[in-house]
Amino acid sequence: KYNGRGTFFELGQNMNLYPDIVKSVYERGHEIASHTYQHAQLPKLDATALDEEIKKTQEACFKACGTEPTLVRPPYGAKNDTVKSAFYSYGLSMILWDGDTEDWRYSKVTNGAQIVCDNIIRDAKAKTGDGNIVLIHDIHENSVAGLEMALDQLSKEGYQFVTVSDLLKYKGHSEYK
C-alpha cells in the first residue's frame, strides 16, 4: 500500500503455530527474522537451552518459508558475549532498534492507536540521516492501527519503508546495535 516492506522478528513458536501467515508475509516481500523461540531472557539460559532457542527458530522459519533468518533481535534487547557468540555460530546478525514505541503500554487504551502513531513518527524522525529502526509489535490492535496511521503520514512526507537487510546494505553495516 505504501510501496514499502518491513522486517518481522518472529518467535519460532508462533511460526510453528501459524506457518501460513508467516509464509504469506514472506511471499509479499517482507523479511522474516528471528526473535528466538519463546521470548526467553537469553543471558539467563545455559548453553544448551540457548542453542535450542536459536536452532528451533531457524527450523520453524525454514519450514514456513523455505529459508532461514539471517537477522535476530534478542528478546528485551538482552544480550551478553555468550548470546552474541551463539548468534554468530548460526550466521545471524544481531539487530536492535533506534526507537521503542512502547506500544505494548497502549494495547488497551482508548486512544492507544493515536499514541502509537505519534510514537512511531517521533522515533522515525529522531535521528538525523537516513534510516531508523523502530520497534513495533504486530500482536496488538492499537499497534497495527497506529502503524497504518503513521505510514500514511510519513509516506506523504517522503519517507520510504525498507527491510532491515536493505537498510543495513544502504548503511554499509552487517549489524545494528
Specify the residue positions occupied by each region the protein language model found.
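Active-site beta->alpha N-cap acidic-glycine motif
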Residues: K1-P69, M149, Q153, Q160, ...
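Hydrophobic aliphatic residue packing
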Residues: V22, I32, V116, I133-V134, ...
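Alpha-helical scaffold elements lining the catalytic groove of polysaccharide deacetylases
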Residues: E27, A40-T67, A78-D130, S143-G146
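A broad, structure-centric signal for solvent-exposed, well-ordered loop/edge residues
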Residues: V22, I32, K79-D81, S143, ...
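Active-site-proximal beta-strand/loop segments in catalytic clefts of secreted hydrolases
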Residues: F9-Q13, T36-Y37, R73-A78, W97-D100, ...
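Low-complexity, flexible helical/coil segments
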Residues: Y18-P19, L42-A47, E68-L71, S107-V109, ...
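Terminal accessory/targeting
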Residues: K1-G6, D130-K177
